[in-house]
């Protein structure tokens, strides 16, 4: 089995990209609290890519202050997202909103260039050609490198890239859906969240394999389900660890059974549950990058080490309920 792609390059990103992205949507950063030691530890661990968004409260500002103090902008790959709907549900997939978000992000980060820029949501009522043209213009202006969509269906991405090819333009080269061992049984936040996890999304995953499209997988550990703080034995207490959105999307019998199997395999291999669940992601013959948000530097190192844990095809199938017993 292919144990995960090793060529960590994304088209139109000038630097190599770490397979693990540091997710900045964690409480201290959202609240605007300086986290210099944590961010230092992220870089020292080998992670060079930060996953951000304009609507992650004060996280971009915290990262910007830290980068200025450390003078480390050129060492990093910065991903940010734009165009998130308002709290009242107004869609924001328009040139005005996208450019406004970009300028605010650039100011918060203290940079004039975002390596990877994604639309946080899609609006199918907006012709995809308009979006491709806008992102190409921003690329030509030197504002962004690679671009793409978060929570975009593969059909819309395919349509966007067909338009780009027909008009000799740069295509979408990154997609950020939910992907992980836990299947998402319900849209966590509403407003068009897209997952490619679970048996019903096999066709989507087949498209990603065929296209070798880089996947930046969010909620890749089920928003706490595979953190090690939830156990199968005490699954009825999961809500003490997982927030209401995670419970809505991931707390179901089939995912708790996946957790049980992760616990069995983790004990067998002498590693953590989160390492097993993360390692599974990289066995799926997809060009996957996993977003992991944690305030614990040692857990971050564990996550990086997960990539080297041996896992057979049969073990991966067992974890995903595709076979009943371990060989």
Regions found by a protein language model. Name each.
Residues 106-127:
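Active-site groove signature of glycoside hydrolases
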Residues 30-42, 93-109, 158-162:
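Short, acidic/polar
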Residues 1-77, 140:
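N-terminal binding-site loop/beta-alpha segment at the start of enzyme catalytic domains
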Residues 74-87, 174-179:
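A short, structured active-site edge motif that brings together acidic residues
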């Amino acid at each position: 089995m292919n144990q995960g792609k090793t060529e960590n390059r994304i088209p139109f990103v000038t630097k190599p990209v770490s397979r693990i992205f540091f997710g900045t949507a964690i409480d201290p950063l959202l609240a605007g609290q300086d986290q210099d030691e944590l961010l230092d530890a992220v870089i020292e661990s080998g992670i060079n890519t930060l996953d951000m968004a304009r609507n992650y409260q004060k996280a971009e500002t915290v990262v910007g202050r830290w980068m200025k103090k450390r003078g480390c902008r050129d060492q990093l790959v910065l991903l940010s997202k734009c165009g998130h709907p308002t709290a009242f549900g107004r869609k924001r997939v328009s040139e005005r909103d996208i450019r406004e978000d970009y300028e605010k992000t650039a100011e918060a980060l203290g940079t004039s260039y975002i390596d990877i820029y994604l639309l946080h949501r899609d609006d199918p009522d907006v012709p995809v050609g308009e979006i491709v043209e806008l992102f190409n213009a921003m690329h030509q202006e030197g504002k962004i490198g690679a671009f793409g969509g978060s929570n975009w269906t593969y059909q819309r991405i395919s349509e966007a890239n067909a338009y780009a090819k027909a008009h000799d333009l740069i295509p979408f080269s990154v997609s950020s859906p939910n992907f992980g061992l836990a299947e998402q049984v319900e849209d966590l936040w509403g407003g068009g969240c897209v997952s490619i996890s679970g048996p019903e999304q096999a066709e989507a995953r087949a498209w990603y394999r065929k296209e070798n499209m880089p996947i930046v997988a969010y909620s890749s550990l089920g928003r706490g389900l595979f953190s090690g703080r939830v156990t199968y034995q005490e699954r009825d207490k999961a809500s003490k660890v997982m927030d209401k959105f995670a419970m809505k999307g991931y707390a179901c019998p089939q995912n708790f059974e996946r957790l049980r199997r992760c616990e069995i395999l983790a004990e067998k291999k002498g590693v953590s549950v989160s390492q097993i669940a993360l390692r599974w992601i990289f066995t799926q013959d997809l060009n996957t990058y996993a977003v992991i948000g944690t305030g614990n530097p040692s857990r971050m190192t564990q996550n990086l080490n997960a990539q080297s844990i041996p896992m057979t095809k049969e073990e991966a199938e067992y974890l995903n309920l595709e076979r009943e017993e371990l060989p």
